[in-house]
């Protein structure tokens, strides 16, 4: 076995001595050594309970006859990091997590690993590591938070963000805002809507690297603990059969993930993460592939922020496997693919029927005939931008308005709260891209403020930064090339007319090409905002959002 490198033979007596210093017996050392990669901490509500998940995983590993060895990786809470310099450090942790797992697994020569993430960048970071290291691996996340309630009204973290805007506009009282603060997040788990964390946890299931139920079983349910024990048992089987991520993460598996992403109306951040994961196994997911899948895949779910349902509702309606079953009825999935269950996709989903068609629409009665995410292009975004079409108000599907240009999310947030944004405006936030930010911050505070003050159905927002999975509205992110690389977004001036046409997938700056070129030529050289530390190194190595913001 792989771990024999560090434990077998007389010459490995020093290494065995070190294992014994931690209390491992000869029998434990002889067994397969399984890394339990935990992202537990006391900072992130989605991770506060992962110690229990890890204990269940380790119990499963021991039941199956192997030896678990746990180590931890970092995890950032995007909600706490939102709206200040901390958000620059969110996306960049994806690479830190992947790199640190690679280092630990290669240094200690584990036979397999169980990955325990839950929140936004930790899930893709761990999946990138699994693809890169390519030893038997399975992912078991911490599960979604339950939705909050105030009386008979359901709420979530996004309700609080939007409540800030509503309070500033005089639409709710301080007591109302405090009630949201107290009740929106009732306990542990990843935030309860179809935001980035839950989207990625669902897609881990679809890719075949997590067991059915991983994306939707609520964090507080005993079923989550049982699933963790099953994951621990299953990794030993994967090691025995030498089934690796490269056997599972095929082109067809990524096409399945994109199809389910479109059906769920998932987070725009998946358009960064799936290409980055695919890149590790030599697969290029370009934006044209994403649009082609969106064009043929119906949108079956409208979960928060696009609708009123939450992940717990999706779970009780049949979960991700039921959504996949619906898609399979029109041949929209590849069914003969390997998964960590030891069964094919088709075998996994054959009995997964929808239990509530109010939550998961039938395939012949979708919310729309095309997917929830769309890639748009035009002279403002030659290399593409992404919009969550399923969360766009109908009247903003096609829009023309004057640009209001800002250099940071904080500037926009302040302008919105001070009533300086008018109906019809097209907000442009630039120099927030992977290099320009650096770190490609999310713009949840500005978009939530727009919703709170009542402008979300009348104002569009365009940025080379990102959006939270909790964002709703006509919000176009990942504009590429970014402003820091002299993309056309750097040429926009206040008052320029911008045209949006989501159905035709266009984003147009109504300025002659010669004038755009002239404006870009006279721009001063971009000056990095951060000149030391990890952020500085990241800004030098990161590539365009159109590639998944991977590192050189």
UniProtKB/Swiss-Prot annotation:
GO function term, MF aspect, one: 2 iron, 2 sulfur cluster binding
Job description of the protein: Functions in the biosynthesis of branched-chain amino acids. Catalyzes the dehydration of (2R,3R)-2,3-dihydroxy-3-methylpentanoate (2,3-dihydroxy-3-methylvalerate) into 2-oxo-3-methylpentanoate (2-oxo-3-methylvalerate) and of (2R)-2,3-dihydroxy-3-methylbutanoate (2,3-dihydroxyisovalerate) into 2-oxo-3-methylbutanoate (2-oxoisovalerate), the penultimate precursor to L-isoleucine and L-valine, respectively.
Active-site residues from the entry: 468
Full protein name: Dihydroxy-acid dehydratase
Acetylation in keyword set: no
Entry binding sites for [2Fe-2S] cluster: 119, 191
Recorded catalytic activity of this chain's protein: (2R)-2,3-dihydroxy-3-methylbutanoate = 3-methyl-2-oxobutanoate + H2O; (2R,3R)-2,3-dihydroxy-3-methylpentanoate = (S)-3-methyl-2-oxopentanoate + H2O
Any one annotated GO CC term: cytosol
Keywords, in A-Z order: 2Fe-2S, Amino-acid biosynthesis, Branched-chain amino acid biosynthesis, Iron, Iron-sulfur, Lyase, Magnesium, Metal-binding
């Amino acid at each position: 076995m792989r771990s024999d490198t560090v434990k077998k033979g007389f010459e490995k007596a020093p290494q065995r001595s070190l294992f014994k210093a931690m209390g491992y017996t000869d029998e434990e050392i002889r067994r397969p050594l399984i890394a339990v990669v935990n992202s537990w901490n006391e900072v992130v509500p989605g991770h506060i309970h992962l110690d229990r998940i890890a204990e269940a995983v380790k119990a499963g590993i021991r039941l199956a006859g192997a030896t678990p060895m746990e180590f931890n990786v970092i995890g950032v809470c995007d909600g706490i990091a939102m709206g200040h310099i901390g958000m620059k450090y969110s996306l960049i942790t994806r690479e830190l997590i992947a790199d640190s797992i690679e280092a630990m697994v290669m240094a200690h020569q584990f036979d397999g690993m169980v990955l325990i993430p839950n929140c936004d960048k930790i899930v893709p970071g761990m999946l990138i590591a699994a693809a890169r290291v390519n030893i038997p691996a399975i992912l078991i996340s911490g599960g979604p938070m339950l939705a909050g309630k105030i009386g008979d009204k359901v709420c979530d973290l996004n309700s609080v963000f939007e409540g800030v805007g509503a309070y500033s506009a005089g639409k709710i009282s301080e007591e109302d805002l405090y009630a949201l603060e107290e009740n929106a997040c009732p306990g542990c788990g990843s935030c309860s809507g179809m935001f980035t964390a839950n989207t990625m946890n669902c897609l881990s299931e679809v890719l075949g690297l997590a067991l059915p139920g991983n994306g939707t079983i609520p964090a507080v349910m005993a079923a989550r603990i049982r699933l963790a024990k099953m994951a621990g048992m299953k990794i030993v089987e994967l090691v025995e059969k030498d089934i690796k991520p490269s056997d599972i993460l095929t082109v067809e598996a990524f096409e399945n993930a994109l199809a389910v992403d479109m059906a769920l109306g998932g987070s725009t951040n998946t358009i960064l993460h799936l290409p980055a994961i695919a890149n590790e196994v030599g697969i290029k997911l370009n934006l044209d592939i994403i649009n082609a899948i969106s064009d043929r895949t119906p949108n079956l779910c409208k979960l928060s922020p696009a609708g009123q349902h939450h992940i717990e509702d999706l779970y009780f309606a049949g979960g991700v496997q039921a959504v996949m079953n619906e898609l399979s009825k029109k041949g929209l999935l590849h069914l003969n693919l390997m998964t960590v269950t030891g069964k094919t996709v088709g075998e996994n989903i054959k009995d997964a029927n929808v239990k509530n068609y109010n939550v998961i629409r039938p395939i012949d009665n979708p919310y729309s005939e095309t997917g929830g995410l769309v890639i748009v292009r035009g002279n403002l975004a030659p290399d593409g931008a992404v919009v969550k079409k399923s969360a766009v108000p109908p009247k903003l599907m096609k829009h023309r308005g004057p640009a209001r240009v800002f250099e940071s999310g904080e500037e926009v947030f302040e302008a919105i709260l001070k009533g300086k944004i008018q109906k019809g405006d097209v907000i442009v936030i630039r120099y927030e891209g992977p290099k320009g930010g650096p770190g490609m911050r999310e713009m949840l505070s500005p978009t939530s403020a727009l919703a709170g003050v009542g402008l979300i159905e009348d104002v569009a927002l365009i940025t080379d930064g990102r959006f939270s999975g909790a964002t709703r509205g006509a919000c176009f992110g990942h504009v590429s090339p970014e402003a820091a690389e002299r993309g056309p977004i750097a040429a926009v001036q206040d008052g320029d007319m911008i045209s949006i046409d989501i159905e035709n997938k266009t984003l147009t700056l109504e300025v002659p090409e010669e004038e755009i070129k002239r404006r870009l030529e006279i721009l001063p050289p971009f000056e990095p905002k951060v000149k030391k530390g990890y952020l500085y190194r990241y800004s030098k190595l990161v590539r365009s959002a159109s590639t998944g913001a991977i590192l050189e």
